[in-house]
UniProtKB/Swiss-Prot annotation:
A GO CC annotation given for this chain: ribonucleoprotein complex
Protein role: Binds to the 23S rRNA.
Naturally occurring in which organism (per UniProt): Shewanella denitrificans (strain OS217 / ATCC BAA-1090 / DSM 15013)
Name this protein carries in UniProt: Large ribosomal subunit protein bL9
Membrane found in the keyword field: no
Keywords from the named record: Ribonucleoprotein, Ribosomal protein, RNA-binding, rRNA-binding
Cited HAMAP family: Ribosomal_bL9
Length: 150
């Protein structure tokens, strides 16, 4: 199925690209979430008429994401207290939600879906650098310090 992308999609293309995708991917993800339209003659004309508006919207989203990334990078280390054993091993773990809640409490809005923990949840005390993806093109690093509760 041929579609016109209305947003930048990782590993697929950017705004205005006409790409061929599987019908299920288009029907279940791209079309319902407004990330693409079916590539027919009428939609191509409508898209070309709205191209400048859509590009301006994407530029505004990118500017907002960049500003948020700068705020996140400017944060001092976010401290999270958790119960831990004598050797610094946590009873449980610190996951995406815990990090997002701690950063939000520190003053910068952060959703748990934006936190990237490629090695899994944090299971020991110490200092960690956690990657945060606020936009498909914008990433920031947040310093997280996990300490044992007294």
């Amino acid at each position: 199925m041929n579609v016109i992308l209305l947003d930048k999609i990782a590993n697929l293309g950017s705004l205005g690209d006409q790409v061929s995708v599987k019908a299920g991917y288009a029907r279940n993800f791209l079309l319902p979430f407004g990330k693409a339209v079916v590539a027919n003659a009428a939609n191509v004309e409508v898209f070309e008429a709205r191209r400048a508006e859509l590009e301006a919207k994407l530029a505004a989203e990118l500017a907002t994401a960049t500003a948020r990334a700068e705020k996140l990078a400017a944060l001092e280390a976010v401290v999270i207290a958790s119960k831990a054993g004598d050797e610094g091993k946590l009873f449980g773990s610190i996951g995406n939600r815990d990090i997002a809640d701690a950063v939000t409490a520190a003053g910068v809005e952060l959703a748990k879906s934006e936190v990237r923990l490629p090695l899994g949840a944090l299971r020991t005390t110490g200092n960690f650098e956690v990657e945060v993806q606020v936009h498909t093109e914008v990433k920031a690093v947040v310093k997280v310090t996990v300490v044992a509760e007294a």
